[in-house]
Amino acid sequence: MTAPAGGTPRRYLVVAYQTLDSDELVQSIRDHAGDGPSEFWLVVPATPVGDLAVRTVPLPPMPVMGGPLAMIGTPEEARRLAQEKLDAAVHRLAGAGATADGEVGDANPAKAVAAALKRRPADEIIVSTLPARMSRWLRQDLPRRLEHEFGLPVTHVEVPKFTLRDA
């Protein structure tokens, strides 16, 4: 796709969390940027720690008796972790030559996207997810729901090999 008429940059809204620093998403952003002037607005939902596929919060040593350890994190902790991921991703994309910034949004990715689009219109949405066997977002049919709700084209980037580095 090319930039809209008048040479204004094409605006992409990227929603990701655990795959935000994946090579696959960075390559997709590079590919889109190669189509012409573009800007990327990253939306990182403040996902509760207990909902992550891989827990990213270090825990102090503690005995676990009678069952699995429950991961409980505060909303503030979720926002802090999301902000750290966002800052690292913006820095990485700048190093790759992309114009990018972003925000931490609601824990619900659809609500986070809706809030971001009210403030910053976009021409296309890019959704990056874990592999289908692990992705809550795919079980919720997020890419299709966003396309239907906002009437924008949606590119889905599935990261096929999710590792601890991607957490």
What are these regions (language model features)?
Residues 11, 124-126:
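Structural motif
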Residues 3-70, 156-161:
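Small/aliphatic-rich secondary-structure junction motif
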Residues 128-145:
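Glycine-rich, Arg-bearing micro-motifs that act as flexible, cationic patches
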Residues 79-87, 140-143:
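Short, surface-exposed alpha-helical segments at coil->helix boundaries
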Residues 24, 28, 85-88, 112-113:
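Well-ordered alpha-helical segments embedded in enzymatic catalytic cores
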Residues 65-83:
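A short acidic, glycine-rich active-site loop
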Residues 1-5, 94-123:
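Structural beta-alpha unit
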Residues 151-167:
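Short, flexible loop segments at boundaries between secondary-structure elements
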